[in-house]
């Protein structure tokens, strides 16, 4: 995110010359350990969106989220790569069968550029659309110009998809996504 948004912590220093940073590519965040002269090393975290990195010694703590699980505090041991989900923000109480998992989409735009989006298909195990029917589509665009969309659990999107709507969340050009 942009540096003029207060409180963002996309990177932290570990005190021994390493930087632990969030890198975003193709709509997914990764946690990287960066050292001078060495290829960056990824700490694999089961999430699509990461934020607010803190490091003490060889332990990093980050907020991690995905499309079907609430945001959680995650602890990562930088030496061993062991990752532990410490606590989720809330209990969801929804059967995952009703949660739509987004698909990353790329499409061409003006000037030979590429734009990105997340497509959330309708998801409800109790309903089957008639053959040949296409669902109504809701298109969402984030507030910009330096914001981006994400794949964090969004109950508003899930409300649409569980009721038979498809949703496309566009990450338009010029944004940080």
Question: Residues of each region from the PLM?
Answer:
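Structural recognition of the beta-propeller blade-terminating site
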Residues: 32-35, 77
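Surface-exposed loop/turn positions within WD40 beta-propeller blades
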Residues: 16, 25-28, 37, 70, ...
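Residue-level detector of Asp-centered blade-edge/turn motifs that repeat once per structural unit
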Residues: 13-16, 55-57
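A short beta-strand motif characteristic of beta-propeller blades
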Residues: 1, 39-44
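Serine-hydrolase catalytic core recognition
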Residues: 51-177
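Beta-propeller blade termini and top-face loops
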Residues: 5-12, 153
